[in-house]
């Protein structure tokens, strides 16, 4: 019995250490989507945008622009090129385009707290005020080095920077970039990671083996 427990323990450790995690984003590469005005903000010419499925027209998520100099059009279909941790192919930030422009921690924090409806808890944001949406868009552009001044979003920038510079700061949100190739890349968020199927099979096999062994011992 002791030997079997040791085997199961090894399987469990391998399952957690060796296997990866899957982030269930609302869209994936090759999905076709379109944009529409969410009715919030847009005094900036940027977000907030609604993203809808081009086939069934379901609302998938709401988002904000990352690249100031690239554009999209409403009610026009776009094919998702991929989901990554950086923007590619545009913007004013003169980084190596092949390497892309990684998302800043402050941008991730702002968008995650916006999506989870936590951004108003510090009296930084009013979900019923268009000016708050415009401020958030300006803050995102500034944090991604797309504009030289955050303007009305400066207070969001400073607050987010203070948060992520704290020595005890940790971030468990799932924020990435929806890459659209030559068009405007957008922020996207997903839920907490879930184990891959291979992980579940490995763990299940170990537990099943333990149950089988115990039954044999009891006979």
PLM region spans:
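Short, charged juxtamembrane terminal tails flanking transmembrane helices
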Residues: 216-219
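Sec/Tat signal peptide C-region and signal peptidase I cleavage site
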Residues: 18-24
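Bacterial N-terminal signal peptides
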Residues: 9-17
